[in-house]
């Protein structure tokens, strides 16, 4: 599987901060470097991942209510990371809206940032089987004099790259930012930034790149074209992968859905959730932060015949509109308070764009080599055929931390 995300708070995702430039700006003092103790960071990260999961489900529900049909694919972790870093520069009601909207209100600012710091350290890795890169960058106008405390904390806590940029030359600036995002996402996110507002003085980007190999790969010879039932009476042809294996499986009678977990190598798992016919809406509305714990208690090992469509989907979202409906609006307005970034009171987030791409095939990741086989007990296999709209979640097992969330409506 190849998962790539762009976030531009103008989040790949991308963020733009707009405002007036003045000649004088009193810098704040540097804070001493942040040192996170292992036990404290892990505790904060675990709490953070629970809140992030709750935010992800809330966001999916909002997007699903806006569009009953169509694919949804996003990274709650990427969006939360970008706005948490941005919250270092916010105060008063602007900060409280971010904390409330992202479900961080139960955590102190210190614990929230320490949790992200620990999480980013643990998730960033590259091995033969797993490649995961999560990063942030701040593109700042050469004339802007940001608060030094903000820059220091963004670097210490979020390892953000600080890149001086000439926003008066928008054409070259746009090219350079797009090259940066493309390079960081292994050329998967192209042309993330378009039509930068002339008033932009700072642009924040966040990206996630993930490549993972299935623990047990599908045999391409078993892949066949089959019907995928989008809705009653309407089907599309899709390449359907097949595998018989031993997997964790369960049925949730309250949400009328079947759950199947398929592991990647390296403590990453894909969870597929297939609702009963006509129950997709019920499933979406029933998602909440403790659902994983509930499903874990129901799961048991089964021999399962699994059919999964080969996927290649991409999605782009205007997060400004979506987050405003979740009560996060001041950060986009003239009277928002981002004075911990700069003393200029006219600073605001101009755009917030989230872009993600998903490729899933028999190997897991394009071009991955090798194969695996399971020794299966002699029993009649269960069936899990993903040939109708379903939900999918990609998460890291140890926290556990949700990285990607999707509704596959039309592969």
Swiss-Prot record:
Annotated signal sequence range: 1-20
SMART domains (alphabetical): SERPIN
SUPFAM superfamilies linked to this entry: Serpins (SSF56574)
Reactive center loop: annotated span: 364-382
Keyword hit for Secreted: yes
Gene3D superfamilies xrefs: Alpha-1-antitrypsin, domain 1, Antithrombin, subunit I, domain 2
Protein name (record): Serpin A12
GO terms for cellular component: extracellular space; plasma membrane
Record text on subunit structure and interactions: Forms a stable complex with KLK7.
Entry keywords, A to Z: Glycoprotein, Protease inhibitor, Secreted, Serine protease inhibitor, Signal
Localisation per UniProt entry: Secreted
Alphabetical GO biological process terms: gluconeogenesis; glucose metabolic process; lipid biosynthetic process; negative regulation of gluconeogenesis; negative regulation of lipid biosynthetic process; phosphatidylinositol 3-kinase/protein kinase B signal transduction; positive regulation of insulin receptor signaling pathway; positive regulation of phosphatidylinositol 3-kinase/protein kinase B signal transduction
Tissue-specific expression: Expressed in visceral adipose tissues.
Organismal lineage: Eukaryota, Metazoa, Chordata, Craniata, Vertebrata
One example GO MF annotation: serine-type endopeptidase inhibitor activity
Similarity-based family: Belongs to the serpin family.
Processing and modification events after translation: Glycosylation slightly decreases affinity for heparin, but otherwise has no significant effect on KLK7 inhibitory activity or thermal stability of the protein.
Source species of the chain: Rattus norvegicus
Activity regulation remarks: Inhibition of KLK7 is enhanced by heparin.
Glycosylation sites: 92, 267
Site (Cleavage): 378-379
Domain remarks in the Swiss-Prot or TrEMBL record: The reactive center loop (RCL) extends out from the body of the protein and directs binding to the target protease. The protease cleaves the serpin at the reactive site within the RCL, establishing a covalent linkage between the carboxyl group of the serpin reactive site and the serine hydroxyl of the protease. The resulting inactive serpin-protease complex is highly stable.
InterPro entries, sorted: Serpin_dom, Serpin_fam, Serpin_sf, Serpin_sf_1, Serpin_sf_2
Function according to Swiss-Prot or TrEMBL: Adipokine that modulates insulin action by specifically inhibiting its target protease KLK7 in white adipose tissues.
């Amino acid at each position: 599987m190849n998962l790539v995300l762009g976030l531009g708070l103008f989040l790949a995702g991308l963020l733009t901060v707009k405002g007036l430039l003045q000649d004088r700006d009193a810098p704040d003092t540097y804070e001493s470097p942040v040192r996170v103790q292992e036990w404290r960071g892990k505790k904060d990260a675990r709490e953070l991942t629970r809140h992030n999961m709750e935010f992800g489900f809330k966001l999916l529900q909002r997007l699903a209510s806006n569009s009953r049909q169509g694919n949804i694919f996003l990274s709650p972790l990427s969006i939360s990371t970008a706005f948490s870093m941005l919250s270092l520069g916010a105060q008063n009601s602007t900060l409280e809206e971010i904390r409330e909207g992202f479900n961080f209100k139960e955590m102190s600012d210190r614990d929230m940032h320490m949790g992200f710091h620990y999480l980013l350290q643990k998730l960033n890795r590259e091995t033969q089987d797993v490649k995961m890169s999560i990063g942030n960058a701040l593109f700042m106008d050469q004339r802007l004099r940001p608060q030094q405390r903000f820059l220091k904390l963004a670097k210490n806590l979020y390892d953000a790259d600080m890149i001086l940029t000439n926003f008066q030359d928008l054409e070259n600036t746009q090219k350079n930012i797009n090259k940066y995002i493309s390079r960081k996402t292994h050329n998967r996110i192209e042309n993330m930034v378009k039509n930068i507002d002339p008033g932009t003085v700072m642009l924040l980007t966040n990206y996630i790149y993930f490549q993972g190999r299935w623990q047990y790969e599908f045999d391409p010879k078993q892949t066949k074209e089959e019907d995928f039932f989008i809705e009653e009476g309407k089907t599309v042809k899709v390449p359907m992968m097949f595998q018989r294996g031993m997997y964790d499986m369960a049925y949730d009678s309250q949400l009328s859905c079947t759950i199947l977990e398929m592991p990647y190598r390296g403590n990453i798992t894909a969870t597929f959730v297939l609702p009963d016919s006509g129950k997709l809406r019920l499933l979406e509305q029933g998602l909440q932060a403790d659902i994983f714990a509930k499903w874990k208690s129901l799961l048991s090992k089964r021999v399962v015949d699994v059919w999964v469509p080969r996927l290649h989907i991409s999605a782009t979202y205007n997060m400004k509109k979506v987050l405003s409906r979740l009560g996060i609006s001041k950060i986009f307005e003239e009277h928002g308070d981002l004075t911990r970034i700069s003393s200029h009171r006219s600073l605001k987030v101009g755009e917030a764009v989230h872009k993600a791409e998903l490729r899933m095939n028999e190997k897991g990741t394009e071009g991955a080599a090798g194969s695996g086989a399971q020794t299966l007990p002699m029993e009649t296999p269960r069936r899990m055929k993903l040939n109708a709209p379903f939900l999918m979640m990609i998460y890291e097992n140890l926290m556990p931390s949700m990285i990607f969330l999707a509704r596959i409506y039309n592969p």
